[in-house]
Amino acid sequence: MKSCVLSNYVEGLEIIVCGYRNRLLFPFRATQVQAYFKVFSFFFFLLLTLGAAAAAKPTSERQVIFGSADKSPGYHWPVEVSAAWNYRELLCKTIGNLVGKPCSRTWRLLTKKKRAYCCCLFCCSSSYCLAGVLCVFCV
């Protein structure tokens, strides 16, 4: 009869291994699981914070920003669309700053010279925004 040994436990979770090595049943050590959990929670709370910051802007400011995005001064996008774009703009600026390409204004993607001001994730033209599509590059 095989003898059961008590292996390392993770946060109170006891893993009993009978005649096998720990790695076959549970390939991670307790310290590795804790490290992965810390990294995951850091990025989760970072995303949560960015979302809260994006939602904190007043509606009128959102409408002014998004009304001038497609060069139609009298048109204001719906609040739901502008709130989603506000979040994408904040995320785009954050990613742009991290990769060393800061975005001064995310929406000025197509200018008279056809030059993209910002080329990072979630930057799209207004037609893509209305379609609800996420594009990977700026045109």
UniProtKB/Swiss-Prot annotation:
Q: The organism sits in which domain of life? A: Eukaryota
Q: What protein is this chain from?
A: Uncharacterized protein YPR064W
Q: Where in the cell is it found?
A: Membrane
Q: Cellular component per GO?
A: membrane
Q: Which residues cross the membrane?
A: 35-55, 119-139
Record keyword Transmembrane present: yes
Ordered alphabetically, the record's keywords are:
Membrane, Transmembrane, Transmembrane helix
Topology in the lipid bilayer: Multi-pass membrane protein
Major location (coarse): membrane
Task: Say which species the protein is native to.
Answer: Saccharomyces cerevisiae (strain ATCC 204508 / S288c) (Baker's yeast)
